[in-house]
């Protein structure tokens, strides 16, 4: 924290690969009002804060731009040391119960802010807000107060964020293992040869990746358009396995103390 402003850094919520694609590589698109990711905890300095900006980076689809749809970020806090109950399964509409009393507010990300973006990743920047009643405004005045003594270290409290899509999105990658001899499991650094979509348009260093059948791979340490270097390969892979990241969405929130 520096001065009266601080941000979360880029948070990497988990969207399980099993909820992004069918294990035979068939696409498994998210529909309007589906859960993108369930509650992710982060810590903020103790006290009351105003949310001043929210940013999302979306992975594209098959190396191309992601569908430009509105998104919502739901913010919540713990009560009596209990985290907000799960919203449900990603890629399905909200089915969980008991989370309403934990809610702090809703941030609405307007897709029009993404128009003309030339980045290989889809970036959304917006300060449009929605209060708990759901009416949109542009004041940027969502104020949150976390639950006291709920953080992981002294002087910090815990807040939770979850994501909801307001339109169809698809995180299948079409990045395919291109090794006729397949790939064995290894505990050492290895480089995977890939084809299909350019790996550099889908992934970035630091991403944790898996195959479409949930075969665990590892963390990306280097990339080219046709190769992915990882710190290890936890499970054996087969030629033409589709590779996905466990965090296709990244979120950054900034606050005024």
Named regions from a protein language model:
Residues 1-27, 148-177, 244-257:
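C-terminal interaction-tip segments
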Residues 37-48, 146-152, 195-200:
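Extracellular and analogous surface-interaction loops
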Residues 44-53, 66-68, 156:
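Extended extracellular/luminal ectodomain segments enriched in beta-structured repeat modules
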Residues 58-68, 167-172:
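Extended, low-complexity, turn-rich repeat/linker tracts enriched in Gly/Pro/Ser/Thr and Asp/Glu
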Residues 65-72, 247:
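Short coil-to-beta strand junction motifs in C2/discoidin
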Residues 72-84:
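Short edge-strand/loop segments of extracellular domains
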Residues 94-149:
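Extended, solvent-exposed segments with strong compositional bias
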Residues 171-246:
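Autoprocessing Asn-cyclization modules and mimics
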């Amino acid at each position: 924290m520096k001065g009266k402003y601080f941000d979360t850094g880029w948070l990497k919520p988990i969207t399980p690969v099993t909820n992004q694609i069918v294990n035979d590589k068939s696409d498994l698109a998210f529909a309007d009002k589906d859960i993108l990711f369930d509650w992710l905890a982060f810590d903020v300095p103790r006290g009351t804060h105003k949310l001043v900006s929210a940013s999302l980076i979306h992975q594209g689809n098959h190396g191309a731009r992601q569908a430009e749809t509105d998104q919502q970020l739901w913010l919540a806090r713990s009560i009596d040391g209990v985290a907000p109950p799960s919203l449900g399964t990603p890629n399905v509409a909200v089915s969980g119960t008991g989370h309403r009393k934990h809610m702090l507010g809703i941030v609405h990300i307007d897709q029009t802010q993404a128009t003309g973006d030339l980045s290989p990743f889809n970036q959304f920047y917006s300060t449009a807000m929605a209060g708990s009643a759901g009416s949109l405004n542009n004041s940027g005045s969502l104020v949150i107060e976390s639950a006291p003594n709920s953080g992981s270290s002294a002087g910090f409290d815990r807040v939770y964020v979850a994501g909801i899509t307001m339109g169809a999105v698809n995180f299948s990658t079409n990045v395919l293992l291109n090794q006729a001899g397949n790939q064995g499991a290894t505990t050492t650094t290895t480089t995977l040869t890939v084809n299909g979509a350019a790996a550099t348009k889908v992934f970035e260093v630091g991403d944790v990746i898996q195959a479409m059948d949930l075969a665990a791979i590892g963390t990306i340490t280097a990339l080219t358009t046709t190769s992915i270097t990882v710190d290890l390969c936890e499970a054996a892979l087969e030629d033409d396995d589709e590779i996905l990241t466990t965090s296709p969405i990244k979120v950054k929130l900034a606050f005024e103390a």
